[in-house]
């Protein structure tokens, strides 16, 4: 039976972006070195943060619009009395 010589070198790691072809520019090296994280459409927020800070439809309708109209009409009435 044939015997192989013992391995003396450390195991090789896969080549990094620096070891790639020299024709790559900085943006290519950046895209190879940094993995893209999913969820870019969430403006950097987690799903929990987005759910907590979103505008939910109000079953009562345009409440804020009505409150603003009432406040403005009260201000006009007070201004006319003076």
Curated annotation (Swiss-Prot):
Gene that this polypeptide is encoded by: NUPR1
Protein name in UniProt: Nuclear protein 1
A Gene Ontology BP annotation from the UniProt entry: regulation of female gonad development
Function text: Transcription regulator that converts stress signals into a program of gene expression that empowers cells with resistance to the stress induced by a change in their microenvironment. Thereby participates in the regulation of many processes namely cell-cycle, apoptosis, autophagy and DNA repair responses. Controls cell cycle progression and protects cells from genotoxic stress induced by doxorubicin through the complex formation with TP53 and EP300 that binds CDKN1A promoter leading to transcriptional induction of CDKN1A.
Subunit text: Monomer. Directly interacts with MSL1 and binds MORF4L1, two components of histone acetyltransferase complex; the interaction with MORF4L1 may be mediated by MSL1. Interacts with EP300; this interaction enhances the effect of EP300 on PAX2 transcription factor activity. Interacts with PAXIP1; this interaction prevents PAXIP1 inhibition of PAX2 transcription factor activity. Interacts with COPS5; this interaction allows COPS5-dependent CDKN1B nuclear to cytoplasm translocation. Interacts with RNF2. Interacts with FOXO3; this interaction represses FOXO3 transactivation.
Keyword match tRNA-binding: no
Species this protein is from: Homo sapiens
Resulting phenotype, residue 33 to Q: Impairs interaction with RNF2
Predominant cellular place of this UniProt entry's protein: nucleus
Induction: Up-regulated by stress agents, such as nutrient deprivation (at protein level). Up-regulation by gamma-irradiation is eventually followed by down-regulation. Expression increases with the tumor aggressiveness. up-regulated by DNA-damaging agent such as doxorubicin.
Segments of this protein annotated with the region Disordered: 1-82
């Amino acid at each position: 039976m044939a015997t192989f010589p013992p391995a003396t070198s450390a195991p090789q790691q896969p080549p990094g972006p620096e070891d790639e072809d020299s024709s790559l520019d900085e943006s290519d090296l950046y895209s190879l070195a940094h993995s893209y994280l999913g969820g870019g459409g969430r403006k950097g927020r987690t799903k929990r943060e987005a759910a907590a800070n979103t505008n939910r439809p109000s079953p009562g309708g345009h409440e804020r619009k009505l409150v603003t109209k009432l406040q403005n009409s009260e201000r006009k009435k007070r201004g006319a009395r003076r």
